[in-house]
Curated annotation (Swiss-Prot):
It comes from Shigella dysenteriae serotype 1 (strain Sd197). This is 4-hydroxy-tetrahydrodipicolinate reductase. It is found in: Cytoplasm. Homotetramer. It catalyses: (S)-2,3,4,5-tetrahydrodipicolinate + NAD(+) + H2O = (2S,4S)-4-hydroxy-2,3,4,5-tetrahydrodipicolinate + NADH + H(+); (S)-2,3,4,5-tetrahydrodipicolinate + NADP(+) + H2O = (2S,4S)-4-hydroxy-2,3,4,5-tetrahydrodipicolinate + NADPH + H(+). Belongs to the DapB family. Its main location: cytoplasm. The gene is dapB. One of its GO terms (molecular function) is NAD binding. Its EC number is 1.17.1.8.
Length: 273
């Protein structure tokens, strides 16, 4: 990677998240907007990326071909869909480009492809790039170690009507953090739906509930409920800019790293807290 400004490419540049990623890239010192990508046939192709994001003219035009921009970026930032992200991943691996991946909804094969690619390129892969959410994940680990063995644990998440995967990647990351702290595998203790005559709650399980409504940016709560008291740890996002800023910060953090798989806790140095 270059010693000067880190040049980033933004996938899905015309989407809500893409536009805010462009704004964040233009605002952070040490980062340069190098390229912007949209799907083939999109009406926004050829538009100035800065103007598209409401940040003024930049001279960076929205392209549809990775080959056309391969010399214009060092790190590729992707918050699109799993199938598109995996195509971008293969290209970045082939050409030695770093990646910041905020896409959610991967199956196990997709996650394994990311792990495999990290042998050759540096990747930050996180379910949520908010600083607050990642601090919350650390708090959940601590709470689970103290309270998890004798409380009922439930995770409730809410997002806008357009979100296509459930539970959210962040909710799953919360469950993983709690399960790991309890020396469990989430797939063995997660309960993703309850309907009809379910019987009493099974001890030691982690329940999930999902809301999809309106324009909710993202709300996540973990509940540790006992008889007579409960602890709730909640994060609420009011703007996607918190995710965009974290993603661009992660791209800058990748400077000088040739390979490896990282998450936001690495970026924020939270692992040792």
């Amino acid at each position: 990677m270059h010693d000067a400004n880190i040049r980033v490419a933004i996938a899905g540049a015309g989407g809500r998240m893409g536009r805010q990623l462009i704004q964040a890239a233009l605002a952070l010192e040490g980062v340069q907007l190098g390229a912007a990508l949209e799907r083939e046939g999109a009406s926004l192709l050829g538009s100035d990326a800065g103007e598209l994001a409401g940040a003024g003219k930049t001279g960076v035009t929205v392209q549809s071909s990775l080959d056309a921009i391969k010399d214009d970026f060092d790190v590729f930032i992707d918050f699109t869909r799993p199938e598109g992200t995996l195509n971008h991943l293969a290209f970045c691996r082939q050409h030695g480009k770093g990646m910041v991946i905020g896409t959610t909804g991967f199956d196990e094969a997709g996650k394994q492809a990311i792990r495999d690619a990290a042998a050759d390129i540096a990747i930050v892969f996180a379910a949520n790039f908010s600083v607050g959410v990642n601090v919350m994940l650390k708090l959940l680990e601590k709470a689970a170690k103290v309270m998890g063995d004798y409380t009922d644990i439930e995770i409730i998440e809410a997002h806008h009507r357009h979100k296509v995967d459930a539970p959210s990647g962040t909710a799953l990351a919360m469950g993983e953090a709690i399960a790991h702290a309890l020396d469990k595998d989430l797939k063995d203790c997660a309960v993703y739906s309850r309907e009809g005559h379910t019987g009493e709650r099974v001890p030691g399980t982690i329940g999930f509930a999902t809301v999809r409504a309106g324009d909710i940016v993202g709300e996540h709560t973990a509940m540790f409920a006992d008889i007579g008291e409960r602890l709730e740890i909640t994060h609420k996002a009011s703007s996607r800019m918190t995710f965009a800023n974290g993603a661009v910060r992660s791209a800058l953090w990748l400077s000088g790293k040739e390979s490896g798989l990282f998450d936001m806790r690495d970026v924020l140095d939270l692992h040792n807290l």
